[in-house]
Amino acid sequence: MPKYMAEWIQWPERVKDVREGRYFDLPPAHYEGIFTLVCNFLCPHCTRRTTRLKWVDGGTWNHNTPISEANTLHPTGLRRVIDELAELRVDNQMGIIWGGGDPTSNPFTYDGMLYARAKGISASFLTNGVFLEVDRCLDADPTLIRISLNCGTEEAYRRFHGYPKGWDYFAQIKIKMRELVRRKIERRAKTLIGISLIIDERNINDVVAAAEEIRAVVDEVGPGIDYVIVRPVMNYSHFQRDYAMVRDGTKDRARYMVEPGGPVWTILNELGIPLILIKDSFDQKPEAHFYESDSDCLAYGLCGEIRHNGDVQLCSDSYGNPEYTIGNIFERPLRDILKSDRRREVLDRINGMKCYETRCPHNSRGHHHNRVFHQIEAMRRAGKMDEVAGWIDDMRACTHDLGHSFFI
């Protein structure tokens, strides 16, 4: 299923590091490629809102920010980043999540994806889809292309994504979804096509309409949508009070709509499209006692982030916060950055702030793997690592090696 959290047990070198407790040496499985912070939307709930407002020179929190070296990684730098990621490929595994901003805002994205593919780097492509160049994206053979739809009517779509009346973005995304599904079918592409539905008070009454729009795509073009992923808006710790914040009652209403028997689930079930709920997004954050045994981060090394200016982040869940920057790839090789004193200093500082407990999004891959790794460390302290070895072997025997890291 396209949100799978056990892939690390398929990677022998990484398993060896975890079993030996060497988390600082754990090779990254993929990097979030935040190679542009330009986007045509101003979503009130945007996870990169603070980044686009404060953590990029000149800011990009408007609809028509010009592409520049201040906000977008250009071809020479992009190739250097890709070359360095390829050198860190371990267990035949290194990937890039092409995000942003929106990757379609970056004119260098598609050529970069082709170059990365030639270097053995897998790709995940996350986009609002309005300006998606379908065939150029499929040419790069990404593991998945996921379009953030969220709404099924023009008014709700405009309100949810924060753009002015009169713009034709909703009409465009309807066209692009159909083109993407049609071309996937015609090309017999292996790329998985996903649709995401993020829910809060602004669109909760429109989510069924979004499911009906997905049905219309399938009816008109064919069965080319592989999954739909659903979660409520996340109230991230770096959000300011005037950002869109979801209420618990909205989460409960959303859960009813998407769980088995609910109206959204019913539509997608009739289509045979898996509906994946990000469970932790619906659930409350763990209580304080959950972190009492140890609140240090152990999962920081598994997935990272490289920003538009070459800054390397400690983990993939810091959303560009400069407090988590451990170096710059244009000043020092990535391999050296990962071994550096600065990385240790940043790690010590964020552990001193109890980041895992107080900042890390509890629906994130980092938080999930922290939970797993802390259980392993508890078993180590109890002298039960033989049981951990057996558990890993059992998990490996009953799970698939997907060949990529994006659903972990």
Model region roles, listed by residue range:
Residues M1-H30, H45, R49-V56, D311-I408:
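Flexible mid-to-C-terminal extensions adjoining Fe-S/redox cofactors in radical SAM and related proteins
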Residues M1-R136, T143-L144, V246:
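Conserved alpha-helical substructure of the radical SAM core
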Residues V90, R182-I185, R342-V346:
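Generic structural signal for secondary-structure transition and capping sites
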